From Swiss-Prot:
One protein family per Pfam: CART
An annotated GO BP: positive regulation of transmission of nerve impulse
Stated role: Satiety factor closely associated with the actions of leptin and neuropeptide y; this anorectic peptide inhibits both normal and starvation-induced feeding and completely blocks the feeding response induced by neuropeptide Y and regulated by leptin in the hypothalamus.
Protein name: Cocaine- and amphetamine-regulated transcript protein
Triggers of expression: By cocaine and amphetamine.
Single GO cellular component term: extracellular space
Swiss-Prot/TrEMBL keywords: Cleavage on pair of basic residues, Disulfide bond, Neuropeptide, Neurotransmitter, Phosphoprotein, Secreted, Signal
Protein family (similarity comment): Belongs to the CART family.
Organism: Rattus norvegicus (Rat)
Example of a GO MF term: neuropeptide hormone activity
Disulfide cysteine pairs (residue numbers): 95-113, 101-121, 115-128
Record gene name: Cartpt
Main location: secreted
Annotated signal sequence range: 1-27
UniProt modified residues of type Phosphoserine: 48
Length: 129
């Protein structure tokens, strides 16, 4: 008798867990049907309650010069040809012996170029030795 109760208890628990989402979904549908949000999202576009933001001056004295300078830089960057070895990810250009091959930023070291055969990038001097 008690062994049948012990077997029945997990089965009833599993059935209850399966039915809980179904019961909760019906309560959510009822909550979604309430008309409390209808006044916020009305179908009629009424812009009288909206404030108009103040317009900033577009023609500030230094702004025109800055825009022109940025446009010149963009033109130069667009016309600049990127070598094939820089386009390929994971490859860096070759540098000469004694040339700076890395940059240190805090505890990190960034590789600028590959050292030629027979030399390696010294992590203290950051040069090909």
């Amino acid at each position: 008798m008690e062994s049948s109760r012990l077997r029945l208890l997990p089965v009833l628990g599993a059935a209850l867990l399966l039915l809980l989402p179904l019961l909760g979904a019906g309560a959510q549908e009822d909550a979604e049907l309430q008309p409390r949000a209808l006044d916020i999202y009305s179908a009629v576009d009424d812009a009288s309650h909206e404030k108009e933001l103040p317009r900033r001056q577009l023609r500030a004295p230094g702004a025109v010069l800055q825009i022109e300078a940025l446009q010149e830089v963009l033109k130069k960057l667009k016309s600049k040809r990127i070598p094939i070895y820089e386009k390929k990810y994971g490859q860096v250009p070759m540098c000469d012996a004694g040339e700076q091959c890395a940059v240190r930023k805090g505890a990190r070291i960034g590789k600028l170029c590959d050292c030629p055969r027979g030399t390696s990038c010294n992590s203290f001097l950051l040069k090909c030795l």
